Amino acid sequence: MANANLKFGLKPINAMGGTNPGGTNMYFIASDASAIFQGSPVQVELTGGTIQISTATGDQRQLLGVFAGCEYVDATTGKLKFSNTWPGSGSADTNFDIKGFVYDNPMQRYVICSDGTNTNRATAKADLFKTAEIENGTSGNTTTGISTAQLDISTAEDSDPSNPLM
């Protein structure tokens, strides 16, 4: 059976050196923030010190990490809710903090689906240690809560060594 090419955002696999990928840190999410899906790349909002989804393909600001999930007090029920998705503004009781959990280890390694394929082994090997843009980073599946971010393989280049493909 062939592998399905499903978009799933960035999934942590391990850190450099093979250590456990399970560590996250807590950051606040602004109550008016857009939806953030599990596996979405996030960055620090410049004005409020909260996290937000990485806003656009090709955004040159440094990523903070990858969104793992959140907790907030539901605006309708008043109950604490744990979710792999921040559904967006209007969802939380603004009297309480909205907490987002982010895989933010700079040595973290991820697996991500690509929007295309390399035609042969030599082409794939040539892309190792290059960088590429992430597309669809702001969208996700509202049923599963999983990001639809994927690697734009056509943008692979070796001018920025900060996030190499391995």
Question: PLM features: residue spans?
Answer:
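Surface-exposed, low-hydrophobicity beta-strand/loop segments enriched in small/polar/acidic residues
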Residues: 1-166
